Regions:
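PP2C/PPM-type serine/threonine phosphatase catalytic domain
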Residues: 1-282
Length: 282
């Protein structure tokens, strides 16, 4: 994993300004409220390496975060739980919504270094890591940041769109192919490594993230979905959309329904799966 991760050194931090359709995003919206739902399952794994947190604060902000741990034994579990707890604690220092982008950018570096420095009970390097998706909202504004292959979706007008990218070797291969640095044959020869992560917390030198420096403006009834890869590797976008568009149920019921369907469709192996839903409405 670390060998593949080392390949990302030539990639710099990304601000989402291309490859994402921003045409449907505008500055409309009223001071409505956020409804929350969350669910996490262990799947068929022996242990839970996902960690999540979501809460509303008195200052009007809502914080949502999911980390998907990686590493043998308890390495991934410790990495994800450490990252979530530290982020939640550090977020207490944010007093104004305008501070969020800078906070998130600096926090990712801090979390990366902290997870990289984790040790096991014998003082050996833990060797674990975790992905990160984090969203902060206030009113109809939203900031986010991500590292790894957990996703953030926006559901609007019967459409679903991921607003961040999977930071895996496929992303790098696609870029190299597009720039003429490799041939299609060379691409195919390396495609078996496509899902190896090239960015995650715990690398110790993280430099690839997706984020926004200007607020993403929500419209009434927009839904934000944060999830670990256990969800989208089992359910298609269409299947996810069919479930979350159920306006007759609460976000909590829908979050639980997503994971219930995941397990219903599981025939053999299912990864830990975590989801957080935030609906901006009345």
């Amino acid at each position: 994993m670390r060998e593949e991760a080392a390949r990302q050194n030539e990639v710099t931090t990304v601000r989402l300004t291309e490859e994402i359709n921003w045409e449907s995003i505008d500055r409309k919206g009223n001071a409505l409220h956020i409804e929350i739902g969350q669910s996490s399952i262990i799947g068929t794994r022996s242990y839970q390496q996902d960690a999540l947190f979501v809460a509303k604060y008195e200052n009007g902000m809502t914080l949502a975060v999911i980390c998907d741990g990686m590493g043998g034994l308890n390495g991934g579990e410790l990495a994800s739980n450490t990252a979530v707890k530290m982020l939640v604690n550090d977020f207490k220092s944010v007093n104004d919504f305008s501070e969020v982008p800078i906070f998130l950018e600096r926090e990712v570096v801090r979390l990366d270094e902290c997870v990289a420095d984790l040790e096991d009970e014998y003082g050996n390097a833990l060797g674990g890591g975790c992905t990160l998706v984090c969203v902060v909202t206030k009113g109809n504004g939203m900031y986010f940041i991500s590292a790894g292959d957990s996703r953030i979706y926006i559901v609007r007008d019967n459409d679903i769109q991921a607003i961040n990218r999977d930071h895996n070797f496929r992303l790098q291969l696609d870029t190299m192919l597009r720039n003429g640095q490799i041939t299609e044959k060379e691409y195919e020869m390396q495609e078996n490594q496509a899902e190896a992560l090239i960015s995650y917390l715990g690398m110790g030198n993280i430099s690839l993230t997706d984020s926004n420096t200007e607020p993403f403006y929500l419209e009434e009834n927009d839904l934000i979905l944060l999830c670990s890869d256990g969800l989208y590797k089992r359910l298609s976008n269409e299947q996810i959309l069919d479930i979350v568009l159920d306006n007759q149920n609460s976000m909590q019921v829908i979050a639980e329904r997503l994971n219930k369907v995941v397990m219903q469709l599981t025939q053999r192996n299912q990864d830990n799966t975590s989801v957080i839903l935030l609906r901006y409405g009345r």
